[in-house]
């Protein structure tokens, strides 16, 4: 259980976020059946959040810290690292494993 990081394309290999950093990310989230439930690319701008401090799901808090600036990866988050037994009705069902394709654009 946890988060699996599958690298798609490398980043700079030097600049990694630390807990508490604010990051700019593009992401697309999908359910196990491949259906998209959310994407920052469907909105203007990027998704900006503080990472590693509980502002986002645990899978992101741990997975994004492993990415360097410019890197693209899939974060596969088991339910305990996503929305758990409650899910996020009506978008995410209970006990859902979620996949996020994430691109770390910058550390702000």
Curated annotation (Swiss-Prot):
One of its GO terms (biological process) is TOR signaling. Pfam families: FKBP_C. Residues 20-108 form the PPIase FKBP-type domain. Keywords: Cytoplasm, Isomerase, Rotamase. Residues 1-20 are annotated as: Disordered. It catalyses: [protein]-peptidylproline (omega=180) = [protein]-peptidylproline (omega=0). It is found in: Cytoplasm. It is an enzyme of class 5 (isomerase). Its EC number is 5.2.1.8. InterPro entries: FKBP-type_PPIase (IPR050689), PPIase_dom_sf (IPR046357), PPIase_FKBP_dom (IPR001179). GO terms for cellular component: cytoplasm. Its main location: cytoplasm. Inhibited by both FK506 and rapamycin. It comes from the Eukaryota. Signal peptide: none annotated. PPIases accelerate the folding of proteins. It catalyzes the cis-trans isomerization of proline imidic peptide bonds in oligopeptides. Belongs to the FKBP-type PPIase family. FKBP1 subfamily. This is FK506-binding protein 1A. The gene is fprA.
């Amino acid at each position: 259980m946890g988060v699996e990081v599958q690298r798609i394309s490398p980043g700079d290999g030097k600049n990694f976020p630390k807990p508490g950093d604010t990051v700019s990310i593009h992401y697309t989230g999908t359910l196990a059946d491949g259906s998209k439930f959310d994407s920052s690319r469907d909105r203007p701008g990027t998704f900006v959040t503080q990472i590693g401090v509980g502002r986002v799901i645990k899978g992101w808090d741990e997975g994004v810290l492993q990415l360097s600036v410019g890197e693209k990866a899939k974060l596969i988050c088991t339910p305990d690292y996503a929305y758990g037994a409650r899910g996020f009705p009506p978008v995410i069902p209970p006990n859902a494993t979620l996949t996020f394709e994430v691109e770390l654009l910058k550390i702000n």
